[in-house]
């Protein structure tokens, strides 16, 4: 008797239903009481290593522990799992990164004591390698965190303009900006903030432009790209 092979459809990720704010509330409800700056420090210092571990682990769900706190992540870094559906309230490494960055921002924005503790303990490698330190401000420094683009209002458009500079300075494919260009700014849709918040975007862009990484000149193509966002150099 011949072998029978039955193929069924695999549900695709429905990005339209994912609301980062709702996901963050669920994350805080589950992990908020345990979170501390040491855990955040361990996470960001080991995020690259964690991504590598996930890419080599053939398990759709993986438990990772940072600073004594266990997080169960949907593994969308293993090659065969990149298209697997992710429930709206589930954690991925990217979402965890954004949630932790927002948690730090929420803890520190009106509390100088906590801000001083965060500045002492937390290191954001992606910011440091670009010459950005805590002295540039909470929102710019944490805005370098992967996933921070989910919270453009919290991080004052810095994740967006950091990606702009990556396109201009590092040669990052502009298509990678599709994710940040879909995000909301508070209650504003992407279509709304792109017309109503141009001045805020320009201010954030110019602030990042003061970093040594971003100070070199702009090509004509780069100027044309920036003009699409109302930024004229």
Curated annotation (Swiss-Prot):
Protein name: Nucleoprotein
Major place of residence: virion
UniProt keyword annotation of Disulfide bond present: no
Residues where RNA binds: 48, 51, 76-77, 95, 123, 125, 128, 166, 182-184
Biological role: Encapsidates the genome protecting it from nucleases. The encapsidated genomic RNA is termed the nucleocapsid (NC) and serves as template for transcription and replication. The NC have a helical organization.
Keywords: Capsid protein, Helical capsid protein, Ribonucleoprotein, RNA-binding, Viral nucleoprotein, Virion
Family, similarity comment: Belongs to the orthobunyavirus nucleocapsid protein family.
Subunit structure: Homotetramer. Binds the viral genomic RNA.
Domain of life: Viruses
Keyword Ribonucleoprotein assigned: yes
Family annotation (Pfam families): Bunya_nucleocap (PF00952)
Localization per Swiss-Prot or TrEMBL: Virion
Primary gene name: N
């Amino acid at each position: 008797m011949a072998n029978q092979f039955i193929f069924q459809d695999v549900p695709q990720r429905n990005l339209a239903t994912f609301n980062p704010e709702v996901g963050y509330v669920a994350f805080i409800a589950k992990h908020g009481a345990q979170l501390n700056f040491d855990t955040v420090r361990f996470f960001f210092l080991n995020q690259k290593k964690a991504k590598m571990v996930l890419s080599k682990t053939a398990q759709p769900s993986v438990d990772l522990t940072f600073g004594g706190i266990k997080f169960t992540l949907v593994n969308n870094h293993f090659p065969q799992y990149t298209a697997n559906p992710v429930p709206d309230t589930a954690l991925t490494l990217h979402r965890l990164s954004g949630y932790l960055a927002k948690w730090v921002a929420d803890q520190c924005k009106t509390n100088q004591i906590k801000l001083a503790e965060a500045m002492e303990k937390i290191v954001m490698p992606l910011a440091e390698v670009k010459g950005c330190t805590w002295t540039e401000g909470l929102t710019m420094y944490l805005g370098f965190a992967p996933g921070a683009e989910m919270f453009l209002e919290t991080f004052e458009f810095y994740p967006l303009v950091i990606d702009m500079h990556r396109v201009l300075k590092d040669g990052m494919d502009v298509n990678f900006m599709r994710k940040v260009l879909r995000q909301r700014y508070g209650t504003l849709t992407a279509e709304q903030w792109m017309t109503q918040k141009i001045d805020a975007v320009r201010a954030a862009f110019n602030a990042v432009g003061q970093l040594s990484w971003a100070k070199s000149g702009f090509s004509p193509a780069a100027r044309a790209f920036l003009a699409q966002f109302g930024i004229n150099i």
